[in-house]
Amino acid sequence: MSTGFLSPRQPWQGRRVVLGVTGSIAAYKAIAIARSLTSLGAAVDTVLTDGARQFVSAISFEGVTGRDSATELFSVDKSALHISLGVEADVVCVAPATADFIARSSQGRANDLLSTTLLATKAPIVICPAMNTNMYTHPQTQRNLKYLSENLSYTVAGPAKGALAYGESEGMGRMLEPDEIIEEIGKALVGSSPLKDKVVLVTAGPTQESIDPVRFISNRSSGRMGFSIAQAAHRLGASVRLVTGPVALPDPYGVDTIRVNSAHEMHVSVSEWLPQADVSIFGAAVSDYGFENIATNKMKRSEKKGPFILDLMENPDIALETKNERKAKSITVGFALETESLLGNARDKLERKQFDFIVANRADEEDAGFDSENNRVTLLFPDGRCEEVPLMSKHLVSEIIMGHILELLKDRP
């Protein structure tokens, strides 16, 4: 068994990010963006406009990044900061971007450090608008955004609909949340990928099999592994459809999420999307058994004498029964959760269900798997290879899984 594994690397790690902040009430969110990027391993250089400093201070960003914030076009030693920032950046993100800054950027204005940095860089640029609804929907703003996107190839991320500044009603113009902007930056850093515009289907979470209107049987799957995979696939440019059982996780940003309850509902949804999928990842912990006759009313203990017996029926094996519905030359990945004979049982599933590889892990590990942010897995391949992946976050495990999928895509047109 191989103990070497495909080294995971999230797109932000070791990269240089220039984070521009302009004068919007949403500027306070940029501090959280800078903190998260730094924790993900990025070197973050912040550039604050005069307007931004009316809302946030440079010292706040320096405190979370450990790096100086820039505000003036020229540094103390008279070096041209806009040149050095632009040349050294792997990505430039402006969050928030006001209507005024968007207008000046579309015209190629260069009257402050941030606008000149945009002109000096060859790195991808992400613009995150934040403004009043009327300002956002104004035809001139829409023309400016369209020009940035279509003519300059900037990524315009957002805005979203939500609460705006005090005294304003809810509307379109709210800046994306920090974690969503982090994903947009990650996507920009990835750039071109074999998964770009491919359709990826992911199943995640448990299923619930109803006994009566208030009771059900299920399992302890949190859905974190599947959600992390879906987000990683989206970051690589894929069109992702996530079919998930009941979990306490928000929909992953940019992912088409379909929520179901039972194994039957998941089966129906998978059958609908599978023929279109270039990559299918069966990560859900589907209940093996359900109930043929679900009580229409709550079962009461007072109405039953003696033992309470429930008749179980076998649920369909979704990955096996939809095998012939897979798109030609598509890639299929399975999961195997076991309490014994991990490799033997996983190998059996790999062969019976004709997966391109399978991700196996034990159900009885306290520091991994169920109810944990981490996982320890073994990847098994049809040619007999086994790859042990040591304990790491599920986000990093998802990067390893996607790395193997990218390798497989190289050999499939």
Where is each model-derived feature located?
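A cross-family phosphate/adenosyl-ligand binding-site feature
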Residues: 1-126, 132-337, 341-413
